[in-house]
Amino acid sequence: MVIRAFLDKIEHNFEKGGRFEKWYALYEAVDTFLYRPASVTKTTAHVRDGIDLKRMMILVWLCTFPAMFFGMWNTGYQANLIFAGNPELLAAQGGWRFALTGALAGFDPNSLWDCFVQGAAYFLPIYAVTFIVGGFWEVLFASVRKHEINEGFFVTSVLFSLTLPPSIPLWQVAMGISFGVVIGKEVFGGTGKNFLNPALVGRAFLFFAYPAQLSGDGVWTAVDGYAGATALSLAAAGGVEGVVSAGVSWMDAFLGIEQGSIGETSTLAILIGGAVLLLTKIAAWRIVAGVMVGMVVLSSLFNLIGSDTNPMFAMPWYWHLVAGGFAFGTLFMATDPVSASMTNTGKWAFGILIGVMVVLIRVVNPAFPEGMMLAILFGNLCAPLIDHFVVQANIKRRLARNV
């Protein structure tokens, strides 16, 4: 193997005393990404497993691909659909993305290639900036602390990118991922020591620091000078009837043929990747079930209460399921094993808390039509407390048993 031989040849330069000793973390990251780690356990009586942390993170990264590829197509489709109905908007477009799309494809909404290229012209730069800037911080902290670079950043980078609208400026992408990696993870010691989901920390920073680029009706479509509302915004204004009258059926929302963040629109694509996470037991099914229980119970309760002034009270649970970032947050964000509850009972409570909070924010709080991000971050804050009470209750039960 040419690559293996090359890596072995230059390895001594990165070891202790070598010319590039301080960059050993970067060398080790490339080496272990391409090949299995050289260090193995040689003592007896060890449990062997078919997956390690690196393979687990790579699998989570791969599970985002259905949502990623569909998101790129849908981003282009939504833009080309608008161009088809508004030729004057197409003539008024400019910029390097528009020129690149015109050189490689066209602007036909019925063309799979045209839509995919248009969407890729928006998503891939976002992902590239996220990976490069976030990777810089990962390498910097790993070099200073003299430890390996963890593959968890593969997951953080793609999750952060998929939660963003296509029109976000790239410099804001760099700001968001920097805040998420440095403040959300590294200041607490790095991978495994953070108590908040770093991808959501970065998005929350952008949401509050630059709300004009993360909310409203003008950010969800890759078309300059066009404003289009998401399903949740339409529901907040006119209920489910308002969503349907705007041309978005429940099936459209389930498939993801609507405006929204790049990777959060298609519940079907998210379920495909999420099913793999659940089958491989990377994602905790108790958390997913808990989120669903909390969401269904509270949304049904609001349906029974009703309201003459707030149409969101009448929004049924199956619309909450396909609207906004609920599916993506449930399967990819809430199930983060580091920032979620660790006890089995705690996972149920953690999930139910998130399900209740997301409906509460969506229905009652008029300032935030989408509540999944805030609900999960609130759940992250409560996770240690939940586990504490679960452990203490178990200790008391054991002590009472021995009395």
Curated annotation (Swiss-Prot):
Pfam families given in the database record: NQR2_RnfD_RnfE
Necessary cofactors: FMN
Xref: NCBIfam families: nqrB (TIGR01937), PRK05349.1 (NF003756)
Main subcellular localisation: membrane
Protein name: Na(+)-translocating NADH-quinone reductase subunit B
Organism of provenance: Azotobacter vinelandii (strain DJ / ATCC BAA-1303)
Enzyme class: translocase
One Gene Ontology molecular-function label: FMN binding
Lineage: Bacteria, Pseudomonadati, Pseudomonadota, Gammaproteobacteria, Pseudomonadales
